[in-house]
Amino acid sequence: MAITKLDVGIKENSYSVANNSSNITVSATITWSWGTWNAEGSAYGYLTIDGTKYNFSGITFNVSGADRGSETVMTKTVDVYHASDGSKTVSVSAFFHGTNTNEITGSGSLALTNIPR
């Protein structure tokens, strides 16, 4: 199996004027080009969200009989805090390693809602 891409998605779910923060969900989705894969809990990776690292282990899913496809392998929902002027661009990076597959990384960023101050 060859993993060809790791896409990072960032969604702003809500924001709080009182806390000067946003609630976001980050996801990492792999795309593969060929092969069969049974992770059986041996895949692992991490998301780094706004400088904080979140580890994922025991990632399990099966890919069988597909020439290509994609699967979301990591998801995390967190609160991030804005600058004193209410602005915030959140940066995210991701790493994934599966059984008998290559390691792959991805990254992304999103300008969040400017919170009125």
Predicted regions and their residues:
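Mature extracytoplasmic or otherwise solvent-exposed domains
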Residues: M1-R117
